[in-house]
A protein has these predicted regions:
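Conserved beta-strand segments that form the floor/walls of ligand-binding pockets within enzyme
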Residues: 9, 15, 75, 100, ...
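Generic recognition of short, well-ordered alpha-helical segments
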Residues: 28, 71, 124-125
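Glycine-rich portal/gate segments that line the openings of hydrophobic small-molecule binding cavities
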Residues: 35, 44-96, 109, 144-167, ...
Length: 177
């Protein structure tokens, strides 16, 4: 069991009534996230990156609605101002994360794609039963991030969509046809 890891493909979308540049600036300053994102316990810079931030390594500690925390290091691997930020995680979560920002007539669509495996043995052991709960928990953390960003920017969060919500909607639509 020591080599078993559970894979997750998680996608979150926020739509905020703010220009893409303001959102991009917040996302590229993760050391400030604990001030506005409730479940970000700490972000510590381990290594500085280049002028764009590529090569930076930060250690994140996250809490959640469930009674556990996750810690991992994230290296920024690509930055395309002001539309994309990509990184590689290693630690209790390993994989890739990518922020994509798209300007809309009424604001900005922010999409986060998180392709990770879990490194905690207990999570992997319980994943066959609890994976939907872990996905729900991820959605709760991300929903709070969208609300926190909106509060911090002083703008409305116009929409939120997460992985477990989409899965639930897909099941519901099949049942109604």
């Amino acid at each position: 069991m020591g080599g078993t890891h559970t894979r997750y493909a998680l996608t979150t979308e926020w739509v905020l009534a703010a220009p893409v540049g303001r959102i991009f600036d917040l996302l590229t300053a993760p050391e400030d996230w604990p001030r506005w994102w409730r479940y970000v316990e700490s972000v510590v810079t381990v290594r500085q990156g280049d002028a764009a931030g590529v090569g930076a390594v930060r250690r994140y500690t996250w809490t959640s609605r469930l009674p556990y925390r996750l810690t991992f290091a994230m290296e920024t691997t690509a930055v395309v101002r002001p539309v994309a930020i990509e990184g590689t995680a290693r630690g209790e979560l390993s994989g890739t994360g990518r922020w994509d920002l798209r300007e809309l007539p009424r604001g900005t669509c922010v999409q986060y794609t998180w392709q990770v495996t879990t490194g905690k043995a207990w999570m992997n052991l319980l994943a066959p039963m609890l994976a939907p709960v872990f996905e729900w928990n991820h959605d709760q953390v991300m929903a709070e991030g969208g609300r926190g960003m909106a509060r911090h920017l002083g703008v409305p969060l116009l929409a939120f969509r997460g992985t477990s919500l989409r899965r639930h909607q897909a099941v519901s639509s099949r049942g109604e046809s």
